[in-house]
């Protein structure tokens, strides 16, 4: 079966694999095609992180499915190196600004509401939202994308709606035929 594997900034490749392939083997193929080290890869299918020891069929991944690759940052090798002090967090800075315009109690209430709205907005974000943000923040050609030869695809390939997956995942995930089709 053919799978599309897509990096956050839009690079993608088509890989031919078996549905019984283990996730760690797929990571090896992705590493060769997109030049992303296996240890830095986090593969996602429909928002679910794939475990290395599971098979693709355990996640009901079928032909023409699209997987996303999130690249983990490199781990620091020297723990003795003190980390650079970060700039002050957004919330204390925002609190200082609010205190200039509101009473302390009102500023606290406004800040609490802003934090709650911010948290809710982040929870609603999906990978497409992150990709759009990354394209704005990292102009085309400036990211460290893959340079190897890959077979480019045109647009996302939607999974087949009629595919029925009877493999019950340990978390109870079960793909059924869409209602109304």
UniProtKB/Swiss-Prot annotation:
The keyword Transmembrane helix is assigned to this record: no
Listed Basic and acidic residues bias regions: 151-161, 168-181
PROSITE patterns xref list: UBIQUITIN_1, UBIQUITIN_2
Note, other: May have arisen from retrotransposition of the X-linked UBL4A gene during mammalian evolution.
Gene3D superfamilies the UniProt entry points to: Phosphatidylinositol 3-kinase Catalytic Subunit, Chain A, domain 1
Compartment list: Cytoplasm
Alphabetical list of InterPro entries matching this protein: Ubiquitin-like_dom, Ubiquitin-like_domsf, Ubiquitin_CS, Ubiquitin_dom, Ubl4_C_TUGS, UBL4B
Upper taxonomic lineage: Eukaryota, Metazoa, Chordata, Craniata, Vertebrata
This protein's name: Ubiquitin-like protein 4B
Cysteine pairs bridged by disulfides in the record: none
UniProt KW keywords: Cytoplasm
PANTHER family attached to this UniProt entry: UBIQUITIN-LIKE PROTEIN 4B
Gene Ontology cellular component list: cytoplasm
Ranges for region Disordered: 139-181
Organism superkingdom: Eukaryota
Annotated Ubiquitin-like domain residues: 1-76
